[in-house]
Regions:
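Compositionally biased, low-complexity linear motifs
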Residues: 6, 11, 21, 94, ...
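Beta-rich carbohydrate-recognition and catalytic domains
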Residues: 36-206, 210-256, 264-315, 339-393, ...
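Beta-rich accessory regions
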Residues: 270, 298-537
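Generic low-polarity alpha-helical segments
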Residues: 6, 36, 132, 414-418
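Intrinsically disordered, low-complexity segments enriched in small/polar residues
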Residues: 12, 31, 46, 75, ...
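Bacterial Sec-dependent N-terminal signal peptides
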Residues: 1-42
Length: 537
């Protein structure tokens, strides 16, 4: 996401002011740490000693990845290699607001315990390092590897601020970097950019994968409010295949951060392959601001087609954006999103760092009402953090029931699975002694779910933050099946086996350690499973 373009769109101004604003941005580039080198260097330590407070500040999540300090947005370059999950991310190491983008880097062997690594990619004379992907070039099609040592190749957008200043329409181009030491250090390709801009203002966020049937690499690229597909035999020379998006899906803003992947499953005596296209768009999300939609269709190596004209969202909550999948993860499809919203991401009241990622999620196909949907649930590795478990059965709720004593105080960090009849409205109130609360509810009359964070704590940093956010209940099952993932400042809800997902962040002064259930009439919790979560830090 180009934040300065976002500001110019969000707050229109005259030409004189626009030129003044652009000049101010360019003058600040050296001050903000813009580097001219084309090779990675070591992380420069930030001023001041942050070690003592790192990962223990107010609002800091306990089991979601967040950077030790400074600004983070989109997950990038997610790839698994030699048993290690690599997470790169849009990063500005000099402030807690958006600035000249770098690729931050973290690694994990289990998807939950993360070690932040030195910055992988710095800005250079071609521009900032915007979003992209990374692949393992197993057969060394790029020629960048060594005998017996295939390269990891990162494909990213170079964003030229000088071109943006001049109001050209070709200041975003696609480039490569490669690693021969399992992702520890990176070298930018000397022939960058490998895909030059044909004259499209928004031309970014390449997501690359190997299409085995066609024996070629496919690049899925966001181009304004469309997706363009390119192919390559070697990751360096690219040919346009087709375009998708006209007259279909949500078009409230620019399309960004796409991903293309498939599922094959048995249907009767035959196997059928479904192709999924993820597209983030900002603004134009289901509840305002940013959001991520998906399309289910067919891909033949040249074009993506879908017969379904319904706009579908991988997450209906306000705080899941720019999510993509890990490459080279075997048969699993593991998703991770940025847990924020461009409406207020730069103003949330954290101090040393800004923004976190969702928990990793397994995505899968799910049938409902005669249609196929993309569903998601927390990856099983997340539950490895459970340190205390509790199981309750047949808990009667007579209009209201407080479960705080049964669940005890575990610092407001737990996973909760609840099943109960879907024949009436019900609200789950996560609260603290000060009366701050985050509410997730089900409206039986409207057949919809909602998150209400109007009294969740700090909401004064953005006029729309303390609102009510809704999502349709897709399932017609007579039993509600709800999974809550609560951390210090976030709530993720996976309803009906992950058919409807909602994510919302909040900023209560104290952890939400208490829980009560409110209903319109007598209601029974058929099953309740509780797991208190340990911190990953």
């Amino acid at each position: 996401m180009n934040f300065f373009v976002y500001l110019l769109k969000a707050y229109p101004m005259g030409n004189q002011m626009r030129h003044l604003f652009a000049s101010w941005v360019i003058l600040l580039v050296p001050v903000l740490g813009f580097s001219q080198s084309t090779a990675s260097t070591a992380v420069k330590p930030a001023a001041g000693d942050v070690a003592a407070q790192a990962y223990h500040e107010p609002y800091r999540p306990a089991f979601h990845f967040s950077p030790k300090e400074k600004w983070m947005n989109d997950p990038n370059g997610m790839v698994r290699y030699d048993g290690v999950y690599h997470l790169f991310f849009q990063y500005y190491p000099n402030d807690i607001v958006w600035g000249p983008m770098h690729w931050g880097h973290a690694t994990s062997k289990d998807l939950v315990h993360w070690q932040q690594q030195p910055i992988a990619l710095y800005p250079d004379n071609l521009g900032y390092i915007f979003s992209g992907s990374a692949v393992l070039d197993t057969t060394n099609t790029s020629g960048l590897g060594q005998p017996g040592n295939p390269p990891l190749v990162a494909i990213f957008t170079h964003h030229d601020p000088e071109g943006e200043k001049r109001h050209t329409n070709d200041y975003q181009n696609q480039s490569l970097a490669y690693s021969l030491d399992k992702g520890a250090t990176w070298t930018k390709y000397s022939g960058n950019p490998v895909l030059k801009n044909p004259g499209i203002t928004d031309f970014r966020d390449p997501n690359v994968s190997w299409f085995a049937k066609g024996k070629k690499w496919i690049m899925t690229l966001a181009t304004k409010d469309r997706i363009s597909f390119y192919s390559s035999p070697d990751l360096k020379s690219w040919t346009k295949e087709s375009e998708f998006g006209e007259g279909i899906g949500a078009h409230g803003g620019v399309w960004e951060c796409p991903d293309l992947f498939s599922f094959t499953r048995k249907e009767g005596d035959k196997e059928k392959t479904y192709w999924i296209l993820l597209v983030s768009n900002n603004p134009g999300g289901p509840n305002g601001g940013s959001g991520t939609q998906y399309f289910i269709g067919d891909w033949d190596g040249h074009t993506f087609k879908t017969q379904d004209k319904t706009t579908r969202w991988i997450d209906y909550g306000p705080d899941d954006y720019a999510g993509v999948l890990w490459n080279n993860a075997g048969r699993r499809r593991i998703f991770l999103g940025w847990m924020s919203n461009w409406d207020y991401a730069t103003t949330v009241p954290t101090s040393t760092w800004r923004n976190a990622m969702t928990v990793p999620r397994n995505v899968f196909l799910q049938d409902a009402n005669g249609k196929v949907y993309l569903a998601s649930k927390p990856s099983p590795e997340v539950l490895s953090l459970a340190r205390r478990k509790l199981r309750l059965r047949h808990v009667d709720v007579d209009s209201s029931a407080d479960l705080s004593n049964q669940l005890k105080d575990d610092g407001g960090k737990y996973i909760l699975d609840i099943k109960g009849a879907a024949d009436q409205s019900v609200a789950f109130v996560f609260y603290n002694a000060a009366g701050e609360r985050m509410v997730f509810g089900y409206n039986n009359v409207k057949q919809e779910y909602y998150i209400d964070r109007s009294a969740s704590g700090r909401t004064d940093f953005h006029p729309g933050f303390g609102g009510i956010y809704t999502a349709p209940r897709i399932s017609k099952d007579p039993v509600l099946n709800l999974e809550f993932v609560l951390d210090r400042s976030s709530l993720e809800v996976f309803a009906d086996g992950g058919l409807t997902v909602m994510t919302g962040v909040f900023f209560s002064q104290q952890p939400l350690t208490k829980l009560k259930v409110n209903t319109t009439d007598r209601w029974t919790i058929k099953e309740l499973d509780y797991a208190a979560m340990a911190s990953i830090w």
